[in-house]
Amino acid sequence: MATPVMIWFDPMCPWAWITSRWLLEVQRVRDIDISWQVMSLAILNEGRPIPPEYADAMANAWKPVRVVIAAEHDHGASVVAPLYTALGERIHLRGRTDYDAIIREALEEVGLPATIAEVGTSTEVDDILRASHERGIGLVGDDVGTPVISVPGPSGEPIAFFGPIMTPAPKGEEAGRLWDGTLLVAGTPGFYELKRSRDAEPQFD
């Protein structure tokens, strides 16, 4: 029986993108069933001081998450993964920042109505977005970011954690071994943190 895995992501986050591609690789070598959930860096950083160089990014961060949550609400959970991939390939692999065009193209690629793009600059789905965000961040605390992953523990209780953060994403059995180790560490009672400073920028492949 496949292990259900929930991942909360923000399409704008390069580290979440890498982790999500790793999970897809894990799915090739381990029996897991991924459920894609939305969280928001814009919500996470509300009320926090934002360095000027990140202000525009935070303002634009609302658009993709609103579009993804609206697409899920109107068309079901099955559209989330392909829409995320279509957005992420443009944002991260191609390095584009023309978000309105990115959203229009991504919606067209996955066969969703172009009108969904309109919610990117409105607040009409924000309650749904905030609820999804809180479900994820409520599992790990608000002093972390995206991605958040949750899996069932031995007794069915959720085991949740931020990350793992890596670059580049491992492939094949290396991806599976990292998954095995992550579950072992995260499932250890009383374990909270294992960290070292990053010395590389996100590497996409």
How would you describe each model-predicted region?
Residues A16-T19, R130-S132:
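Short amphipathic alpha-helical surface micro-motifs
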Residues W8, W17-R104, G181-V185, E193, ...:
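Structural alpha/beta surface segment adjacent to cysteine/selenocysteine redox centers
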Residues L24, D98-D205:
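C-terminal cap of thioredoxin/glutaredoxin-like
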Residues D10-C13, Y54, M58, V119, ...:
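Charge-dense, low-complexity intrinsically disordered segments
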Residues C13-A16, I149:
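The canonical Cys-X-X-Cys-His
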Residues M1-M6:
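Extreme N-terminal starter segment of soluble prokaryotic enzymes
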